[in-house]
Amino acid sequence: MDEQPRLMHSHAGVGMAGHPGLSQHLQDGAGGTEGEGGRKQDIGDILQQIMTITDQSLDEAQARKHALNCHRMKPALFNVLCEIKEKTVLSIRGAQEEEPTDPQLMRLDNMLLAEGVAGPEKGGGSAAAAAAAAASGGAGSDNSVEHSDYRAKLSQIRQIYHTELEKYEQACNEFTTHVMNLLREQSRTRPISPKEIERMVSIIHRKFSSIQMQLKQSTCEAVMILRSRFLDARRKRRNFNKQATEILNEYFYSHLSNPYPSEEAKEELAKKCGITVSQVSNWFGNKRIRYKKNIGKFQEEANIYAAKTAVTATNVSAHGSQANSPSTPNSAGSSSSFNMSNSGDLFMSVQSLNGDSYQGAQVGANVQSQVDTLRHVISQTGGYSDGLAASQMYSPQGISANGGWQDATTPSSVTSPTEGPGSVHSDTSN
């Protein structure tokens, strides 16, 4: 409707005066009694009515539009407008090829389908939650609670996405329908081809597609933030408690020459730490890899655990010596038998300190002095009973001559006091 006044102003004189069909209509309408002034007056009234349509109310506009469509000069006016359009080629374009789908929009659609946000709801959020659970690992009630929270949050994101997408589609359809109806209505007065209507619809959809892309992009960002938060939280919760870490580190550094626990040792460690055997195996595998990659960094930690083991063994030895020699507590040459309540733990400590288990670790000077003190205390106690090997907690392993790992023999060299003081030996170096 905006083009009508401009077109009529620019081409009224030429088109309407020079058009033969329109002249014939004017002559027929005016009759023989009316002159040139009457025809100009009639044309001026039509143009004035067209100019004032935009300023009228809806009811008045509908009445004027109906009067215009029923006017006897309406066909002549339409023919003039068609000729003007053909001459000036206004809004005439060839059939445009269908534009390819935006690759960014395709990536967003694929991501939303993979995360279970788009597409059918059945199994979508559950599948995404199961994938997140498999990636994070772990088990237990805490893990199930986290998965429930993840599914709830994902379902909320999905609901918001579909609600906004429905609003978007509804607004796009309503606006497209309104424009198409408006163009069809205007096509009764001015020439508008169906191809031009289709082109206008494609322009509207292209404008709305930017809104759709923004909605999908924000939804994908929300899903990624949700996944990162839950995966990070699960990764933090997978850390063992301090007591379990201490137990595993003590065993690792006391068997540093061969940190490969047997199945029995793994089961015992799993019971002590309150974890599964597979978690114990995974922990030792990761610990060996980290230790090999950065030996210098873990050397200080190894020295700390070695000193702690030495102090514990010294206290146990002194306590056992006093318990077995109550009449002569200060006797240094006592050859009485020395029995321990926890001989397996002490043997593990003595084996590590008196043998070759730490020869590759370069124990510090302060730790070496504690080792010498421990050996002196052992020489004062006289010896150990032969039942020590039977109560051994872990199976020590050694390195064979060809460089492979093998089980060490039972430490039969732990003998009675008949061999003399300080006769404790370790067989882990075979």
UniProtKB/Swiss-Prot annotation:
It comes from the Eukaryota. Residues 1-40, 317-338, 395-430 are annotated as: Disordered. It is found in: Nucleus. Forms a heterodimer with MEIS1 which binds DNA. The PBX1-MEIS1 heterodimer binds a cAMP-responsive sequence in CYP17. It also binds a consensus region in the SOX3 promoter. PBX1 forms heterotrimers with MEIS1 and a number of HOX proteins including HOXA9, HOXD4, HOXD9 and HOXD10. Forms heterodimers with HOXA1, HOXA5, HOXB7 and HOXB8 which bind the 5'-TGATTGAT-3' consensus sequence. Also forms heterodimers with HOXA5, HOXB7, HOXB8, HOXC8 and HOXD4 which bind the 5'-ATCAATCAA-3' consensus sequence. Interacts with PBXIP1. Interacts with TLX1. Interacts with FOXC1. Interacts with MN1. SMART domains: HOX (SM00389). Residues 233-295 bind DNA. Gene3D superfamilies: Homeodomain-like. Belongs to the TALE/PBX homeobox family. The keyword Transmembrane helix does not apply. This is Pre-B-cell leukemia transcription factor 1. Residues 407-418 have a biased composition (Polar residues). The record marks N286 as: Required for binding to the NFIL3 promoter. Keywords: Activator, Chromosomal rearrangement, Developmental protein, Differentiation, Disease variant, DNA-binding, Homeobox, Nucleus, Proto-oncogene, Repressor, Sexual differentiation, Steroidogenesis, Transcription, Transcription regulation. PROSITE patterns: HOMEOBOX_1 (PS00027), HOMEOBOX_2 (PS50071), PBC (PS51978). Residues 323-338 have a biased composition (Low complexity). The homeobox is required for PBX1 nuclear localization and for transcriptional activation of NFIL3. Residues 127-232 are annotated as: PBC-B. Transcription factor which binds the DNA sequence 5'-TGATTGAT-3' as part of a heterodimer with HOX proteins such as HOXA1, HOXA5, HOXB7 and HOXB8. Binds to the DNA sequence 5'-TGATTGAC-3' in complex with a nuclear factor which is not a class I HOX protein. Has also been shown to bind the DNA sequence 5'-ATCAATCAA-3' cooperatively with HOXA5, HOXB7, HOXB8, HOXC8 and HOXD4. Acts as a transcriptional activator of PF4 in complex with MEIS1. Also activates transcription of SOX3 in complex with MEIS1 by binding to the 5'-TGATTGAC-3' consensus sequence. Residues 38-232 form the PBC domain. GO terms for biological process: adrenal gland development; animal organ morphogenesis; anterior/posterior pattern specification; brain development; branching involved in ureteric bud morphogenesis; embryonic hemopoiesis; embryonic limb morphogenesis; embryonic organ development. The record marks T88, V89 as: Breakpoint for translocation to form TCF3-PBX1 oncogene. It is linked to Congenital anomalies of kidney and urinary tract syndrome with or without hearing loss, abnormal ears, or developmental delay: An autosomal dominant disorder characterized by variable congenital anomalies of the kidney and urinary tract, sometimes resulting in renal dysfunction or failure, dysmorphic facial features, and abnormalities of the outer ear. Most patients have hearing loss, and some may have global developmental delay. A chromosomal aberration involving PBX1 is a cause of pre-B-cell acute lymphoblastic leukemia (B-ALL). Translocation t(1;19)(q23;p13.3) with TCF3. TCF3-PBX1 transforms cells by constitutively activating transcription of genes regulated by PBX1 or by other members of the PBX protein family. TCF3-PBX1 binds the DNA sequence 5'-ATCAATCAA-3'. Expressed in the kidney. Expressed in the endothelial cells of the glomeruli and interstitium (at protein level). Expressed in all tissues except in cells of the B and T lineage. Expressed strongly in kidney and brain. InterPro entries: HD (IPR001356), Homeobox_CS (IPR017970), Homeodomain-like_sf (IPR009057), KN_HD (IPR008422), PBX_PBC_dom (IPR005542), TALE_homeobox (IPR050224). GO terms for cellular component: chromatin; cytoplasm; nucleoplasm; nucleus; RNA polymerase II transcription regulator complex.
